UniProtKB/Swiss-Prot annotation:
Transmembrane segments: none
Subunit structure: Part of the 50S ribosomal subunit.
HAMAP family documented for this protein: Ribosomal_uL22_B
PANTHER family cross-referenced by the UniProt entry: CHLOROPLAST 50S RIBOSOMAL PROTEIN L22-RELATED, LARGE RIBOSOMAL SUBUNIT PROTEIN UL22M
Record keywords: Ribonucleoprotein, Ribosomal protein, RNA-binding, rRNA-binding
Pfam families assigned to the protein according to its UniProt record, in alphabetical order: Ribosomal_L22 (PF00237)
Highest taxon listed in the record's lineage: Bacteria
The keyword Ribosomal protein is annotated on this UniProt entry: yes
MF GO annotations: rRNA binding; structural constituent of ribosome
Full protein name: Large ribosomal subunit protein uL22
Family: Belongs to the universal ribosomal protein uL22 family.
């Protein structure tokens, strides 16, 4: 049995989010939350929120044991890019691309033995 949580259109670059998500893949939920709280990156807040949501989904919707949960899958997909322009000298303008991400975390119960 597995429980899943997603956050879509998060205003964080997918590259920066993947850097953080790679640290927690395959880890126990408690260990992953500890890593996220001690990592000084901007992407940790939304990722922590998704991990907690997946944990709550597992407990409430599937009656899984919260102590035996681990992150079986977690990945970041690229969302749409918000395109903006910054005015520059001599009537020019340069583009600013604000990237978004879709975060997905899947948790499973660890088998005893």
């Amino acid at each position: 049995m597995e429980a899943k949580a997603t956050a879509r259109y998060v205003r964080i670059s997918p590259r920066k989010a993947r850097e953080v998500i790679d640290m927690i893949r395959g880890k126990n939920i408690e260990e992953a939350l500890g890593i996220l709280q001690l990592t000084p990156k901007g992407a940790t807040k939304p990722i922590e929120k998704v991990v907690k949501s997946a944990q709550a989904n597992a407990e409430n919707n599937f009656e899984m044991n919260p102590d035996s949960l681990y992150i079986s899958e977690c990945y970041v997909d690229e969302g749409p890019t918000l395109k903006r322009f910054r005015p520059r000298a001599m009537g020019r303008a340069t583009p600013i691309n604000k990237k978004t991400s879709h975060l997905t975390v899947v948790v499973k119960e660890q088998k005893e033995g």
